[in-house]
Amino acid sequence: MIPVPDIVSPRVRLLVSVRDAAEAALARDHGADLIDAKDPDRGALGALLPETVRAIAAASGDRLTSAVAGEPRDAAEASACLAALAGTGVGYLKIAWAPGCDAVGLVLPARLPVIAVLFAEDGPSGADVPALAAAGFSGAMIDTRGKDGRRLTDHLSLTQLAGFAAACRAEGLLSGLAGSLALDDIPALAALGPGYLGFRGGLCARADRTGRLDPERIAEGARRLAAFVPRVEAA
């Protein structure tokens, strides 16, 4: 049975991006709340092969799972990317989506939640969220397109990120924040009340996102988030 994503949760949870089944098991055993299938060698949202995603879903046990489906140019390509991974056993899919992108022709998989991932470099804001809800997305996340050392907060202020998270709550959407995050970013970003904080490089040795995950860093991230209780006003 596929674990069902918890769209509204009072606790900020840990998303760990993994590249294979071995990393999925590592993330599962050291406290990841959500195990996210992604190829770090192919940019911000590099999709893995369906068979690799299936293996990751199987190795994740009872943890929630997701898989990135790529960076499509338009709604038609997005539909095809999502369809390619719809039968892999993950709890939901993620797809790159530009603010203001025309959703006409977008076909989302039946009974499988899809998260729109907006890139921080494009200047997304809470004003973009209602259109995402209207298009049928179940959630929205901000990540960084470039993996050049700049972090999420180098592109967007905490005030802007707080507005985005609040808009997601108002629309009943799952929300997430990611983008070269370090463990020390947890207090400031968790206080904004997103559903998830997403990590890859910050949980790898030497902060190299293309390297292997460090189990001690995963456990530390889980511990810090479990200990942090954000105070978020109801939308």
Question: What are the roles of these predicted feature ranges?
Answer:
Residues 27, 56, 140, 189:
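Conserved, mostly hydrophobic/aromatic
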Residues 12-33:
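N-terminal basic/disordered segments at the start of proteins
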Residues 34-45, 88-100, 139-149, 192-218:
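Glycine-rich phosphate-binding active-site loops on the catalytic face of alpha/beta enzymes
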Residues 50-60, 103-106, 199-235:
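C-terminal helical cap(s) of enzyme catalytic domains, especially alpha/beta-barrels
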Residues 59-174, 184:
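Conserved anion-binding
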Residues 34, 38-64, 68-69:
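Glycine/small-residue-rich interface belts in oligomeric ring/scaffold proteins
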Residues 1-17, 58, 233-235:
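N-terminal amphipathic alpha-helix/helix-capping segment at the start of soluble metabolic enzymes
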Residues 19, 44-52, 77-80, 152-160, ...:
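Alpha-helix N-cap and loop-to-helix initiation/capping positions
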